[in-house]
Regions:
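C-terminal recognition in membrane/secretory proteostasis and scaffolding
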Residues: 1-118
Length: 118
């Protein structure tokens, strides 16, 4: 059978995404949609969540996270939505984890950084 074209109705980029705020880390982010991609000028094939706010002097700002950066991986888990990212952060916090490894796309480069979460 021929590979079918993905159904345009279920295109990830059209899913309306809720903004998630992680107050204790000082981070706010949303899933990637057509709108957020064009707003932050991000490549089409990039997956993850885009940072919409970073609180001053927070764990997030100390780690070097900036608005418009994309978190594509948390603790080596690929992130596809804001809810999923929140769950990974919540699970890490429940386990008492002090920091997580993030893969972040910033200024056209992908890099890893450590984010303290408590």
């Amino acid at each position: 059978s021929e590979a079918a074209e993905p159904d345009p109705k279920t295109n990830d980029d059209d899913v309306k995404t809720n903004e998630v705020e992680l107050d204790d880390i000082g981070l706010r982010f949303v899933g990637l949609t057509k709108d957020t991609r064009s707003q932050y000028n991000l490549p089409k094939n990039l997956k993850g969540v885009v940072i919409t706010a970073v609180k001053r002097d927070s764990f997030a700002s100390n780690a070097g996270l900036t608005v418009g950066s994309v978190i594509s991986q948390i603790s080596q888990i690929n992130v596809k939505s804001a809810d999923e990212a929140k769950k990974i952060f919540d699970d890490a916090a429940k386990k008492g984890t002090e920091s997580v490894l993030l893969q972040v796309y910033q200024n056209d480069f992908s890099r890893f950084l450590i984010l303290k979460i408590k």
